[in-house]
Amino acid sequence: PYWKVFEPEFHLSGYDPLTYLGVTDWDFVYNVVRHPLLAFIIWPLWLLNAGLSALFGVNCVQYVVAVPVMLASFYAYLFIYRINRDVIRLQQYDATLLSAFYFSFAYIMLSVLVPDHFTISMFLLMFTLYLSGLLIRFNREFTWYESALLFLITAGVTLSNGIKVFFSGLFVNGKSFFRPTY
């Protein structure tokens, strides 16, 4: 029933209102092969929306989804900035300029405005890049449990993100990435 509410009004090419549907009426609206944990990640949002809907008598899904998307985009920006400052060691002006330049790309601007999992993936991947950069800078390696936790969370949002976490582990750990202890 909710698909009929969101689908005629949601016109962004390449995006669909699946997050709105899942938060409004919790179900496995995402393909669980590609997004194994995403339905469970949005479950607390469904609980919050159900409580707010019962309290106010209207569907508050736009507000409930907007808060985590805004937080994820803000922290993705902060991680881009910190990568530029702490890992690449740029000056403050240059780091700010490059961070703003990254967010000026149309695809990034559109992704942080739509209610989809792209912003959450971007936040998690920027965190992975930042953490990997710091580990390389301080000549440390990923431990197996750090990689496993990072893989579980990022691959839970989108399975292809897990491959990127493994690549970061390969670049950080080098040859020791292939050891059985890792």
Residue ranges and their predicted role:
Residues 1-15, 19-26, 182:
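Transmembrane signal-anchor helices characteristic of membrane glycosylation enzymes that use polyprenol
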Residues 27-59:
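Short hydrophobic/aromatic helix or loop-helix immediately within or flanking a transmembrane segment
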Residues 78-104:
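Transmembrane-helix signature of polytopic, membrane-embedded enzymes
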Residues 52-75:
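Loop-to-helix entry region of an early transmembrane alpha helix in multi-pass inner-membrane enzymes
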Residues 141-173:
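Membrane-interface alpha helices of multi-pass inner-membrane proteins
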Residues 120-138:
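Specific aromatic-rich, kink-prone transmembrane helix
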Residues 176-182:
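Non-catalytic, alpha-helical, charged scaffold/linker segments
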Residues 113-118:
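Short acidic/glycine- and proline-prone juxtamembrane loop motifs at membrane-interface regions
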